[in-house]
């Protein structure tokens, strides 16, 4: 990793990452497609109401996983492999146990959670059943991306991709089996999702059990490793948790402003946005191990080059993806609708919503890149400021104002306006960090890890 070109290293990580993350994202997309095609728009609305539980679970994983991955990459760059194993093992043990305990504690409150997410009486039964199944299998849904990020940092991105693809294919098969063959309703989609993640975890675990890389389990536990990882992972965890709150806010605003029909519409917009967002996030994740390793090795010129390359990639890919989505909007919408539900007015309104909403993703790609980059080199405060701005910072202010004065149109324009403002914040933070010498002065990180 010291000598290879940044472009070569980026694509070495990015290509498997984008395939693995798109495979992960298709869990939700496949749920929406099968539910919509078999059960209709009301079922899509019910599943969309339950959707915030997914960012919530991923936020919990990122709180420990992304921070631990940055620290592990930092230690590997310094050739301190046993410390890297201590961080990996401690975080994995803690997350597995705590995720199981938390999910079992929340299970009796499934109906309360569904109502909190904005479900009305018509959607409550389906939303509740979906949430119950997801909670029962949530430990696999947390461990899958956690194991994935450690495998990537252990220089096995192809294995991470294969695990995600296998799990995704299993999810597709079982979605079809439970919904179309057994006809068990929306809970069948939830069961398929859990099974897919469980299979993905099993594929990844053999890498650690068989000690195929530098990272494997050791019989030690360090609470300070967990705490340091959590501190380092706060920005990305906040981003994902805020995404859960954002979906809740949009669902609530749309339900009050325009009703269930437009909640279904927003569900389709968000399902189709998954691959767009995932690709942008994969760009950021692709530079993370390179930036962390280079910073640990004190190669600041390489750190700067990684950042510049990542920004260019995020901008170009964002523009290309927006163009693809703009010209394929009608085709993408029909993926989630029964033929009888594809009325011209609904289609036209959904296309308009997509074309407005997705402008925000062009800015989001570069903002995400800045947030993940600063997190990768342990600039947690800067990363947190950027993260807060692109998640809830502006949305929570703009959404009630614009929805009040402009109705549903105000809701759609909220997202791109908020992301443009967040991008300006990211530029300001980057300027501040450059003035502080982020690319010219190495700062030894005070990572509180048990000495080995």
What are these regions (language model features)?
Residues 133-152, 163-171, 189-202, 284, ...:
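Short runs within selected transmembrane alpha-helices of multi-pass transporters and secretion channels
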Residues 44-104, 141-160, 265-327, 364-383:
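Small-residue-rich hydrophobic transmembrane alpha-helices
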Residues 1-14, 72-139, 183-234, 291-359, ...:
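Short alpha-helical transmembrane segments in multi-pass integral membrane proteins
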Residues 56-59, 171-175, 200-205, 274-278, ...:
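Hydrophobic transmembrane alpha-helices of multi-pass small-molecule transporters
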Residues 12-31, 133, 167, 196-200, ...:
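Transmembrane helical elements of multi-pass membrane transporters/channels
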Residues 2-39, 55-66, 71, 96-103, ...:
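N-terminal transmembrane alpha-helices
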Residues 26-45, 114-121, 177-184, 244-271, ...:
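Helix-terminus/linker motif at the lipid-water interface of multi-pass membrane proteins
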Residues 106, 149, 175, 179, ...:
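Structural signal for membrane-spanning alpha-helices in multi-pass inner-membrane proteins
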